[in-house]
Design a protein with these regions (language model features):
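Membrane-proximal envelope and lipid/glycan-remodeling enzymes
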Residues: 1-537
């Protein structure tokens, strides 16, 4: 995150540097000050999520694009720099899938401005080799066209109304419209006062026309980064935002603030303007900067979402840092041990230690205990066919995979109901009115049916329908479902890899119904007869 802010300011400083040659100016942080003043920006800087990588990437791309937009008249473009920029732009889709909009636009600009076909080939190869190679690997190894997390979040469909709620939730506590409104006249004044040195104006040539020169220019790069921010914001509004306060709008905000990351306050010298005009310009810029600085001081100390910060309301949005600080009792939960104070976490270790023969752990209504489903063990000590009995296995079915994974060790399988680490849940349909980011929910009956667990009473909890378990077990025999699961569960061989590549589009689109009976009907399988509910005491 810090590297991203440094690169942001270096890029913006480079943007204004040519017009400051021979002039005295004071460089002041403006957009950078706005970004670091927003509390979610500071929270997610150390969250362990991809936020830091995103800022570093966007800052690097911004700085390199600014350098690319300022070719010297007397010096030809470096092919090494051109290839490096194309490589960085191509990596956009590897940082986050939706960043393909940013990296793709940068590559298009470079192709338009390229003077020769040799350079265009270089741009295509440097920008496309790694993303294409990794895409082939993803298709062959995972059998998917997109990351599994993108499948779980399911970009299909739109939730514009929820997205507007998310924007309002991010804007309201900090009045973010204030610095954005102040940044517009600030940027316009800086553009008006900007000197256009002749050494940055490449001569028109047959292979470098007006369109190419217009694309490879500072105004075009400013339009590129601002337009990218707008596109990213619209993308996330369409998606419905997120359940974490402010998280997915931080990257769009970063892009929108890039052209005014730092601003030069020119000292009047009477060269380009009269001293009186220069003083008016300095006064206007200083006034706008003071407004931004004042807002930043206020926003940095804002209470944020207030009383609703840790309560899951109808919007489904919470302040994640405060939520976990409150739930664990630690102001800054950092280590695995800190999260043992989260509800159910200490109890999971007790449950694992008390089940040496193996078990599936299901979250109960009591935060101090887990419901247990025993592992099926052959009574003779050997499996059918004379094979040795399988080793005891443990699995935990819960939403919060991170804190579980840190504390239960590598021998315990952690699976979730929303599909982030569970391929079966990831291929369910998105629930229309569910909490954003958690809008897939696999019933525990499927997990019991899919593993070596007891599937009858009294081995399963009373709230589990044994008939559903039986139906889910039958539904898992659907040929299409088995093919999808085998794509990630079967041993990886060359044949499996090539088969996954060929069927990745089909597997990515495949969805099952989370109600076992409906899934049997969808697949055209017979609905098995199952026992009724457990006897009441």
């Amino acid at each position: 995150s810090l590297l991203g802010m440094v690169l942001l300011m270096l890029g913006t400083g480079r943007l204004y540097a040519p017009s400051l040659r021979g002039r005295r100016a004071i460089m002041l942080p403006a957009g950078a000050l706005v970004y670091i003043a927003v509390p979610p920006a500071r929270d997610f800087a150390t969250s362990g999520l991809e936020s830091g990588l995103v800022l570093a990437y966007l800052g690097l791309l911004w700085w390199m694009m600014v350098c690319w937009s300022q070719p010297l008249r007397a010096r030809p473009d470096s092919q090494m720099f051109l290839g490096a920029l194309a490589f960085v732009a191509g990596c956009s889709v590897l940082v986050r899938p939706e960043f393909a909009l940013i990296g793709g636009l940068a590559l298009i600009m470079m192709l338009i401005a390229a003077r020769t076909w040799r350079r265009r080939v270089l741009i295509v190869l440097a920008g496309g080799f790694l993303p294409v190679a990794y895409q082939i690997f993803r298709m062959g190894y995972y059998g998917l066209l997109v990351p599994s997390t993108a499948l779980a979040k399911d970009a299909a469909g739109d939730k514009w109304s929820q997205g507007m709620i998310y924007v309002s939730n991010f804007n309201r506590p900090y009045a973010l419209w204030v610095p954005l409104v102040l940044s517009v006249p600030l940027g316009l004044l800086l553009m008006t006062a900007r000197r256009r040195p002749s050494f940055l104006r490449p001569v028109l040539a047959p292979d470098y026309g007006r369109v190419a020169r217009a694309v490879q220019s500072p105004p075009a790069v400013v339009a590129f980064i601002v337009g990218s921010g707008v596109l990213q914001a619209l993308y996330w509004i369409r998606q419905g935002g997120d359940f974490m306060h402010g998280r997915v709008l931080l990257a769009p905000l970063f892009c929108l603030l890039a052209p005014v990351g730092v601003i030069p306050i020119l000292l009047p010298d009477g060269k380009d303007f009269s001293r009186e005009t220069g003083r008016w310009l300095v006064g206007a810029l200083s006034g706008l900067w003071l407004g931004i600085a004042g807002w930043s001081l206020w926003a940095a100390n804002s209470p944020g979402m207030g009383d609703d910060a840790t309560r899951v309301t109808y919007s489904g949005i919470v302040d994640e840092r405060r939520f976990y600080a409150q739930a664990t009792g630690h102001a800054h939960p950092l280590t695995a041990a800190d999260y043992l104070d989260y509800p159910r976490m200490a109890a999971v270790l007790t449950a694992l230690n008390n089940t040496p023969e193996g078990a599936l752990l299901l979250p109960s209504g009591n935060y101090n205990q887990w419901d247990l489903v025993p592992m099926i063990r052959p009574s003779s000590g050997t499996a059918p066919g004379g094979k040795p009995a399988p080793k005891p296995q443990h699995a935990v079915f819960f939403t919060n995979m991170g804190m579980l994974g840190m504390n239960v060790g590598l021998d315990v399988r952690v699976i979730d109901q929303i599909g982030l680490v569970n391929p079966l849940a990831a291929h369910t349909e998105r629930l229309k009115h569910a909490r954003i980011g958690h809008d897939k929910n696999l019933f525990p009956d499927w997990v019991i049916a899919d593993g070596p667990w007891v599937k009858w009473y009294p081995g399963i909890p009373g709230y589990i329908d044994q008939q559903w378990v039986t139906q889910a077990e039958a539904a898992l025999q659907c040929p299409a479902t088995r093919a999808v699961l085998n794509s990630v569960r079967a041993p990886i061989t060359l044949h499996r890899f090539l088969s996954n590549v060929l069927h990745s589009y089909e597997f990515t689109r495949y969805r099952i119904d989370r109600v076992p009976r409906y899934e049997l009907v969808r697949c055209g399988l017979d609905v098995p007869d199952g026992p009724g509910p457990p006897p009441r005491e």
